[in-house]
A protein has these predicted regions:
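N-terminal leader segment of winged-helix/HTH proteins
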Residues: 1-31
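A structural signal for well-ordered alpha-helices, especially hydrophobic packing surfaces
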Residues: 13, 17, 104, 140-144
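N-terminal helix-turn-helix DNA-binding core of bacterial DNA-binding proteins
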Residues: 21-65
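Canonical helix-turn-helix DNA-binding module
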Residues: 47-92, 98
Length: 156
């Protein structure tokens, strides 16, 4: 028998991370760090997130680091707006500015190119593609439930 499912998932995830890192760094979008790009993507998908919601998705990163990153995206790069909720002034929400939305589109375009290359290289038949989509949907549901990440535009 070949490798275990767990081992294959690890091998694939490692290679995807390496491939994405090399391709994304070649096409650096908006001079963003990986963390900044991910925050832009999260806020873009959710529409609006509190700083604590964003921080909860980074359990190994301190709240002050997340807050500093968001402040940099707000003050220095003008990619997000920070808003204090009138009904609870202890909560600050983050939304994308128009410039942030443009950068998000660039990020998506760059990633679409990378993922398209991967998808085409698999050479799946229509039946294999349908089955593969079901596997991917199940993985997405797992991560959404594990990380409480209910994204607005995820249609499975």
């Amino acid at each position: 028998m070949g490798k275990s499912t767990e081992s294959l998932i690890y091998d694939m995830a490692f290679r995807v991370r390496l491939y994405m890192a090399s391709k994304i760094s070649e096409q650096k979008v908006g001079d963003l760090t990986d963390r900044e790009s991910l925050i832009i993507e999260l806020v873009g998908m959710k529409g609006s997130m509190s700083i604590s919601e964003i921080g909860s998705l980074y359990p190994t990163v301190s709240n002050s680091t997340i807050s500093t990153t968001i402040t940099k995206l707000w003050k220095d790069k003008k990619l997000v707006d920070k808003n204090i909720l009138p009904e609870n002034q202890r909560v600050t929400t983050v939304t994308l500015t128009e410039k942030g939305k443009q950068i998000l589109e660039e990020i998506k375009h760059t990633q679409a190119d990378v993922f398209s290359t991967i998808s085409v290289s698999l050479g799946l038949s229509p039946d294999q593609t349908e089955y593969f989509h079901e596997i991917l949907k199940n993985a997405i549901i797992f991560f959404d439930e594990t990380m409480w990440l209910k994204l607005n535009n995820t249609k499975l």
